[in-house]
């Protein structure tokens, strides 16, 4: 089992793909998870020649692509769409929540078409949530209100998943706070809300689970047939008795934050247990480094990360160790 090691390009959006591809190839990555400004979803849905040019550029540098990212677009499908998401939509839609939503739905349908044209079977991303702000049950939140949130997710996303089915592409939700699914319980409920359809699965990222005090390896084993894609990102939890796990309204990188993302191997994620769990479910897709660390130089981190992941990327045993005495 030789899983490819890729890197998410969204955090490198300031570097053109023509420069980023040879850089990441030089670091030793096998491919790119295209996001940010490195792949135009709408253009890719309509222009096969554009997709061919992207492929040719990657081929030139011995890179492949197994997934494209639709995170910032997908978020706007179910999000309240306040001013925070204005930067993620066309400028003329700023301050127009419903118009952003309509655009996001159309663009996520295009994401499936663009993936097909690029020869990719997975779109990773977010779905948003109309009920995330109701996480803390005060004032009291009726169960019916929560159920309506899951049904709203189903109404908004089932037509999108219909297009994914038509294109032979799957959507992998990054289970994450601010999404309809942020732990195992809400993931199961979200899947049930859309009829457990195969178009909807998981982009597994342990960093978002660990700071919520979840067990990432257990999560993998609970959804063995729905782990469609994997992000490798670390997180460090540093509760001091003064700060809250909720973040204290402090930005990433602030010294007093209770938790922060780290380059793989520099936080609290038990990556060996994750690899063992992935081996257990026979996952053979990419291990995609999503590099985020406010305390480390970016290129140093990306180079170190692939070496760390390469050492972890072991196959399961093909024999029982106690059969050969």
Language-model segments: which ranges?
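Active-site beta-loop-alpha junctions enriched in small/polar residues
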Residues: 8-12, 35-37, 70-73, 128-130, ...
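Acidic/histidine-rich catalytic cores of soluble enzymes
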Residues: 19, 31-32, 68, 146-268, ...
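Short, well-ordered coil/turn segments that N-cap beta-strands
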Residues: 1-5, 28-30, 59-66, 118-122, ...
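Glycine-rich, proline-tolerant flexible connector loops at the mouths of alpha/beta enzymes
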Residues: 35-55, 127-134
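Short amphipathic alpha-helices and their capping/turn segments at secondary-structure boundaries
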Residues: 18-25, 45-66, 107-121, 215-228, ...
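Active-site acidic/histidine proton-transfer and metal-coordination neighborhood
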Residues: 14, 18-19, 23, 59-60, ...
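Boundary/entry segment of secreted carbohydrate-active catalytic domains
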Residues: 1-15
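C-terminal helical cap(s) of enzyme catalytic domains, especially alpha/beta-barrels
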Residues: 298-318
């Amino acid at each position: 089992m030789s899983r490819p090691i890729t890197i998410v390009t969204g955090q490198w959006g300031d570097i053109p793909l023509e420069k980023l591809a040879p850089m990441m190839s030089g670091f030793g990555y096998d491919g790119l998870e295209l996001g940010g400004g490195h792949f135009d979803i709408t253009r890719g849905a309509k222009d096969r020649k554009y997709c061919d040019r992207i492929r040719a550029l990657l081929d030139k540098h011995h890179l492949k692509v197994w997934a494209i990212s639709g995170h910032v677009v997908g978020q706007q499908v179910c999000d309240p769409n306040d001013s925070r998401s204005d930067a993620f939509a066309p400028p003329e839609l700023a301050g127009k929540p419903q118009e952003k939503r309509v655009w996001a739905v159309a663009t996520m349908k295009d994401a499936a078409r663009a993936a097909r044209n690029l020869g990719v079977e997975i779109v990773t991303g977010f779905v948003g949530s109309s009920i995330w702000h109701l996480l803390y049950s005060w004032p009291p939140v009726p169960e019916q209100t929560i159920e309506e949130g899951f049904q709203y997710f189903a109404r908004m996303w089932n037509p999108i998943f219909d297009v994914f089915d038509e294109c032979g592409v799957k959507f992998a939700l990054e289970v994450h706070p601010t999404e309809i699914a942020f732990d195992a319980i809400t993931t199961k409920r979200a899947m049930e809300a859309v009829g457990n359809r195969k178009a909807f699965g998981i982009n597994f990222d342990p960093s978002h689970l660990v700071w919520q005090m979840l067990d990432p390896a257990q999560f993998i084993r609970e959804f063995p047939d729905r782990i469609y894609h994997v992000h490798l990102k670390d997180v460090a939890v540093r509760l001091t008795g003064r700060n809250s796990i909720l973040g204290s309204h402090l930005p990433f990188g602030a010294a007093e934050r209770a938790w922060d993302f780290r380059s793989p191997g520099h936080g609290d994620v038990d990556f060996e247990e994750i690899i063992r769990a992935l081996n257990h479910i026979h996952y053979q897709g990419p291990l995609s480094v999503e590099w985020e660390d406010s305390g480390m130089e970016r290129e140093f981190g990306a180079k170190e990360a692939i070496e760390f992941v390469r050492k972890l990327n072991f196959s399961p045993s093909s024999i029982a160790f106690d059969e050969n005495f």
